[in-house]
């Protein structure tokens, strides 16, 4: 291509292009690399905008395999074009300049005329080049204006302005394509130098094109391997960017042209086969001609560290590596950073300490958070106090209503069977109370097991009407109404009966979620006091999923699947665990695939279902179960069956391993929960449904037992043996229960997977039925002698299953008959002396015939259709002839002929006693390791359940009961009406809501008494700390405390003995603030043990335990003086502590850590006031008289509270002193409080008379001042009116 053609192609480029043409001498006559033209054009089309118009012929002339030769001496030969590789050309072409530096016209190392305008571009001998090529300055002038430089950026000290070196400078090296990104229509990128070489006739080198293609593939393979094994491209690209930016500010001084020529020759050799050596900092950068001018303005040298060169590769192969990395970084932003465009680098200094401003800001934030948390806590305390007062007021209202309502008492007295039902002359006895409670329980039916009714009346009249209506129908809507009816009846009969309420106010402390999280250190997350933020938790989710996938992989590794298949299914297995946990809620939906895959997913999910079931049962056994926790067992078993049906598995796929593990786990679960929990009747239906589902499942598994043997693995056969051993143990227990008197376990079917279940597990599934009116299905204990034996046998019969109970009742028939003949079992005949025939006709005729008519017993109609084995034979034969008539002769509401069955009684949720847990199995079967591993993690699974039960309180909790005073026993007797028990503190504590912190007794004289110490087992340790401060509570209930009687004194002594007889606490923390015991380490600053050799009550960890009575308060001399006591002479301080900081007026500093001597009460004596002599009042150092107590008044003086007496005494020249009665702290200091004056006795009358005269004079003066002010105001008003009238007359306005 000729020079004219080349100029026509690049007509829009630069007007000063002819200036840059070097001399016509060409060294070597080498042509450019035209073989790279095609590849370069392809790269240019995929690269930056603005290069689309370039022709392939011109673009191919950019690259050259060989390095440029240096300029020899001062010869005016044309320099050979710089030998830049294709890698450097495209790398610099598509790399925009960094954001942080201003752009400059061109590079310094290129030695172009435009580079001289840059501040950093110091091109030597540039002026000489201009002189040599001056005639070519007449091309386009418009392009020159685009590259004009601000004169402020010129470097006047550069060699450009040195005139002596103009002729010696070599021809400059230039780049015609500099700034090509700013030209949109440019089609030519080569200078005249490349066209001159084109004329030389050099041939194309096609080998370079093939080498470029091969190196491209090799580079891609190397990069793909490097992404997997070596450091990611992100780090490499970041290193390149940092090195490039570090080179921006370096100023290079070229030493000589010979050094440049020598280094160019070295690059030639390196490009032909030798490994590329890193150039020095002074070496010119091998930047491409196609690179943007902005890069060349900033970058004089590009370090070789930015280019990765492989041994044996050409320069073009080196380019392929870097370019491929850059292109891949643009395509995949997730792996490598985007190094194009504006770039900012921020280096995080994590190891440095925070600055003072950051510390101040952090401390301020922490202070604000602490203040807000304190406000939240204070607000919660106020809510606690308000709710407590509201509940106290409500209970007082109902107690007053029951005592003042005569109509309610009259209505309840009509319920009595005879006039002889009142207490005897001896008073209330235990025998009478037991008969009375049993009769009342059978007479009044309980409709709902809830404590409160659904609709509670608002006014007193509505409450009375509701109670009267229930008394008339002989039924109670809820437990509260039944208790109210009993209290009204007992008080009407003359017994001392009081209402006991377990108050449940709002929590004393707010929940942790309600507080603002406070971190002790901003960077330390482990020491934070609260949980992390939601964003942090979301970031940690993938980490947890990876950890959760590890156990799944371990389980699947036991199967025959290859390792490659495991890697492919890792993600699915990691999701198997959360999916299987969600099956307990019935939300799992899985898809069936191949047979081995389904088997493994089934094994994982079923194991996790078992784990959740076992842990839910464990948590429900520890705490009193609530309504939310009850459906858990049934839902888990139903979800297990639904899981099998959804998977679409045949019986062959149901492995014996799953069945055996389910059997073992369910047996362990039921026995463990029955041992620890006081399960309520709401929990039993769920147990029955779970047992039913397990039975159906095991029946299916047993039907396909032969087919399972073919599929079972060695681990499954091992579990089979354990399940068979378990069945043997259960059958042995059944056989032993038939022979022994006390059954150990309940009989279980051979196909039943449940061992040690309660009776409810064997009952048929419940059918939907209408709610019926039922009473309490518990047979009360009427025997008052041999209480321990009866309790043991009673608990055995309750815990056994129906079949075992039937056998036990048959064995104990004789014993039951002998007991039933005892008069203690019966209500006295006088209590039920009169009967009505009409009531007898309502009973069952068959039972009436079987019952003996000679004795009157308690009516068992409320258990007429209970399980036959549950009833005693002597009582089961009793007819309804024992129905109790009414005194008023009114028609009674007839009882139903048939009582509901035992299942209905259980479903009615009326009693807790029937469903007490069974006895624990002594020899439990050996559990598999999988079950033991699951037990370790149950605490994590139980947190959600415990939190839910804590929020939802049980609606059937018995937080109300009754206490009756026994004259014979001389104590208050607690009664559980719903179970018919007396002296049942433990039963009441179990049935009440946990946390008995406020148990108050509301007596018949409208007074209030705190009886928490009787019912709270941990009153002295934990519950006492859960209450509000004692001072506030005492002040609140003080108006409602009755006068102290003999009964109160006796009760207080009993309450004190309850805790004094208990053993010592087991931990050191429980001794802190204990009301009875103390450790020396827990003594406060002003406390001490006296006597010094106080007797020890025990030891804990080698530390002596003392009585709280030995702890005494110690005070300093000044504090004892305020109590009118002084330290005895010669007494040594019992203890020396650090005094509080004091302000020294002389030095105006705060004195700290001064020793303070403190003394005990036994080291002090009463204060003896001094005597006034010669009319002078004795004073202290401050001129005042300390009168903290009346006894501290000095002798022969009087205390006169007359204001202004000091002024009168000064006039009369009589000694007088101020009386200090205390100190007040305000305005940041302590100020004395004065009250009156102290004068001698002989001056009392004189001073008093003078003060009265002075008061009269003061009154006259005040009157004169008042009159003067009034007259003066009138005078001003009159004068003002006169002036106004005069102005009106004068100016007419």
Curated annotation (Swiss-Prot):
Biased composition (Basic residues): 288-301
GO annotation (BP), single: nucleotide-excision repair
PTM-bearing positions, type Phosphoserine: 31-32, 37, 533, 537, 908, 911
GO annotation, cellular component aspect: cytoplasm; cytosol; nucleotide-excision repair factor 2 complex; nucleus; XPC complex
Region (Disordered): 1-199, 217-239, 255-341, 514-640, 658-919
Main subcellular localisation: nucleus
Location of the motif Nuclear localization signal: 922-938, 1195-1211, 1275-1291
GO molecular function, one term: damaged DNA binding
Comp. bias regions, Basic and acidic residues: 18-30, 520-578, 598-612, 693-711, 806-818
Keyword vocabulary terms for this entry: DNA damage, DNA repair, DNA-binding, Nucleus, Phosphoprotein
Subcellular location: Nucleus
Compositional bias of kind Low complexity: 51-60, 580-594, 658-692
Leader peptide range in chain numbering: none
Compositional bias (Acidic residues): 31-43, 313-335
Domain of life of the native organism: Eukaryota
Biased composition (Polar residues): 101-130, 226-238, 720-737
NCBIfam families recorded: rad4
Quaternary structure and partners: Heterodimer.
Entry function: Involved in DNA excision repair. May play a part in DNA damage recognition and/or in altering chromatin structure to allow access by damage-processing enzymes.
Family membership: Belongs to the XPC family.
Protein name: DNA repair protein complementing XP-C cells homolog
Organism of derivation: Drosophila melanogaster (Fruit fly)
């Amino acid at each position: 291509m000729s020079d004219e053609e080349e100029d026509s192609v690049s007509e829009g480029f630069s007007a000063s292009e002819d200036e840059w043409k070097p001399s016509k001498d060409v060294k070597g006559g080498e042509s450019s690399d035209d073989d790279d033209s095609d590849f370069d054009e392809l790269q240019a089309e995929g690269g930056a905008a603005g290069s689309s118009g370039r022709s392939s012929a011109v673009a191919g002339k950019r690259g050259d395999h060989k390095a440029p030769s240096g300029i020899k001496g001062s010869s005016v030969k044309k320099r050979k074009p710089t030998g830049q590789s294709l890698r450097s050309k495209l790398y610099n072409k598509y790399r925009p300049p960094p954001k942080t530096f201003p752009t400059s016209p061109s590079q310094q190392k290129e030695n172009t005329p435009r580079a001289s305008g840059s501040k950093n571009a110091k091109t030597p001998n540039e002026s000489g080049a201009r002189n040599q090529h001056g005639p070519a300055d007449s091309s386009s002038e418009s392009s020159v204006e685009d590259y004009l430089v601000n004169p402020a950026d010129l470097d006047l000290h550069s060699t450009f302005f040195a005139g002596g070196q103009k002729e010696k400078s070599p021809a400059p090296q230039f780049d015609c394509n500099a700034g090509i990104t700013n030209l949109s229509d440019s089609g030519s990128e080569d200078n005249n130098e490349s066209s001159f070489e084109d004329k030389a006739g050099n041939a194309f080198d096609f080998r370079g094109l093939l080498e470029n293609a091969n190196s491209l593939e090799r580079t891609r393979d190397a990069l793909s391997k490097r992404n997997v094994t070596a450091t990611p491209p992100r780090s490499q690209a970041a290193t390149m960017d940092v090195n490039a930016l570090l080179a921006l500010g370096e100023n290079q001084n070229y030493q000589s042209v010979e050094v440049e020529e020598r280094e160019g020759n070295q690059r030639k050799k390196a490009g032909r086969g030798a490994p590329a050596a890193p150039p020095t900092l002074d070496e010119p950068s091998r930047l491409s001609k196609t690179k943007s001018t902005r890069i060349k303005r900033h970058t004089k040298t590009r370090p070789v560290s930015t280019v990765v060169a492989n041994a044996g590769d050409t320069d073009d192969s080196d380019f392929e590596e870097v370019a491929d990395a850059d292109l891949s970084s643009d395509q995949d932003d997730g792996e490598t950073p985007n190094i194009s465009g504006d770039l900012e680098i921020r280096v995080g200094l994590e190891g440095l300490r925070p600055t003072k401003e950051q510390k101040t800001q952090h401390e301020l934030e922490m202070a604000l958070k602490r203040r807000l948390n304190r406000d939240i806590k204070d607000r919660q305390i106020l809510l606690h106090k308000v709710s407590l007062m509201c509940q106290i007021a409500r209970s007082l209202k109902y107690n007053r209503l029951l005592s003042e309502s005569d109509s309610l008492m009259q209505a309840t007295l009509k319920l009595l069977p005879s006039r002889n039902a009142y207490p005897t002359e001896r008073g209330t006895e235990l025998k009478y109370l037991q008969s009375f409670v049993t009769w009342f329980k059978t007479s009044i039916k309980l409709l709902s097991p809830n404590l409160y009714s659904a609709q509670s009346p608002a006014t007193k009249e509505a409450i009375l009407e509701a109670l009267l209506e229930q008394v008339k129908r002989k039924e109670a809507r809820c437990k509260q109404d039944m208790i109210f009816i009993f209290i009204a009846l007992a008080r009407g009969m003359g017994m001392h009966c009081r209402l006991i309420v377990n108050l449940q106010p709002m929590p004393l402390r707010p929940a942790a979620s309600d507080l603002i999280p406070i971190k002790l250190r901003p960077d330390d997350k482990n020491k934070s006091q609260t949980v992390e933020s939601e964003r942090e938790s979301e970031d940690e989710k993938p980490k947890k999923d990876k950890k959760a996938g590890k156990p799944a992989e371990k389980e699947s590794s036991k199967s025959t699947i290859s390792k490659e298949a495991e890697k492919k299914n890792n993600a699915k297995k990691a999701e198997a665990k959360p999916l299987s946990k969600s099956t307990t809620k019935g939300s799992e939906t899985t898809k069936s695939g191949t047979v081995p895959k389904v088997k493994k997913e089934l094994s994982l999910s079923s194991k996790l279902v078992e784990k959740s079931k076992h842990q839910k049962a464990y948590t429900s056994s520890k705490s009193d179960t609530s309504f939310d926790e009850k459906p858990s067992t049934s839902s888990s078993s139903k979800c297990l069956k639904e899981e099998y049906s959804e998977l679409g598995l045949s019986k062959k796929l149901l492995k014996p391993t799953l069945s055996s593990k389910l059997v073992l786990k369910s047996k362990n679960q039921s026995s463990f929960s029955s041992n620890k929990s006081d399960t309520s009747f709401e929990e039993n239906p769920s147990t029955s449904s779970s047992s039913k589902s397990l039975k159906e499942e095991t029946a299916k598994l047993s039907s396909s037992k032969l087919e399972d043997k073919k599929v079972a693995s060695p681990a499954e056969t091992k579990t089979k043996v354990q399940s068979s051993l378990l069945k043997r143990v259960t059958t042995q227990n059944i056989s032993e229960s038939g022979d022994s008197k006390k059954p150990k376990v309940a009989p279980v079917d051979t196909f039943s997977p449940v061992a040690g279940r309660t009776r409810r597990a064997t009952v048929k599934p419940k059918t939907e039925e209408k709610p019926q009116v039922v009473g309490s299905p518990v047979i009360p204990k009427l025997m008052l002698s041999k209480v321990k034996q009866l309790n043991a046998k009673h608990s055995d019969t309750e815990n056994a299953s129906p079949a075992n109970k039937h056998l036990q009742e048959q064995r104990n028939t004789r014993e039951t008959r002998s007991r039933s003949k005892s008069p203690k079992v019966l209500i006295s005949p006088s209590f039920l002396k009169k009967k009505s025939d009409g009531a007898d006709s309502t009973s069952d005729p068959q039972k009436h015939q079987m019952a003996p008519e000679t004795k009157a017993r308690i009516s068992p109609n409320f258990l007429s259709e209970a399980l036959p084995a549950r009833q005693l034979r002597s009582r089961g034969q009793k007819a309804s002839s024992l129905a109790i008539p009414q005194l008023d002769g009114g028609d009674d509401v007839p009882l139903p002929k048939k009582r509901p069955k035992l299942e209905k009684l259980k479903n009615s949720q009326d009693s807790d006693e029937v469903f007490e847990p069974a006895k624990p199995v002594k020899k439990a079967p050996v559990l598999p390791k999988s079950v033991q591993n699951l037990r370790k993690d149950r605490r994590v699974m139980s947190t959600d359940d415990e939190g839910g039960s804590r929020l939802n309180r049980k609606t059937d909790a018995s937080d109300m009961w009754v206490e009756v005073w026994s004259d014979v026993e001389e104590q208050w007797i607690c009664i559980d009406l719903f179970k018919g028990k007396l002296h049942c503190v433990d039963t009441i504590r179990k049935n009440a809501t946990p946390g008995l912190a406020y148990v108050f007794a509301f007596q018949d004289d409208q007074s209030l008494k705190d009886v928490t110490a009787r019912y709270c087992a941990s009153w002295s340790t934990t519950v006492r700390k859960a209450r509000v401060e004692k001072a506030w509570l005492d002040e609140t209930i003080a108006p409602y405390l009755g006068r102290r009687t003999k009964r109160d004194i006796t009760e207080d002594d009993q309450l004190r003995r309850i805790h004094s007889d208990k053993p010592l606490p087991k931990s050191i923390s429980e001794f802190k603030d204990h009301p009875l015991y103390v450790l020396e380490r827990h003594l406060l600053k002003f406390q001490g043990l006296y006597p010094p050799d106080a007797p020890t009550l025990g030891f804990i960890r080698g530390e002596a335990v003392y009585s709280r009575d030995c702890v005494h308060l110690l005070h300093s001399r000044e504090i004892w003086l305020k109590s009118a006591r002084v330290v005895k002479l010669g007494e040594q301080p019992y203890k020396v502590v650090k005094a509080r900081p004091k302000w020294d007026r002389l030095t105006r500093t705060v004195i700290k850590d001064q020793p303070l001597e403190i003394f005990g009460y036994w080291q002090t004596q009463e204060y003896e006031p001094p005597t006034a002599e010669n009319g002078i009042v004795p004073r202290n150092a401050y001129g005042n008289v300390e009168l903290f107590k009346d006894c501290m008044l000095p002798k022969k003086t009087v205390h006169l509270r007359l204001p202004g007496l000091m002024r009168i005494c000064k006039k009369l020249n009589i000694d007088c002193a101020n009386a200090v009665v205390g100190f007040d702290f305000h305005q940041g200091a302590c100020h004395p409080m004065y009250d009156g004056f102290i004068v001698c006795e002989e001056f009392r009358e004189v001073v008093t008379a003078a003060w009265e005269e002075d008061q009269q004079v003061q009154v006259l003066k005040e009157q004169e001042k008042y009159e003067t002010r009034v007259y003066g105001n009138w005078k001003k008003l009159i004068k003002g009116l006169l002036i106004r009238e005069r102005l009106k007359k004068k100016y007419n306005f």
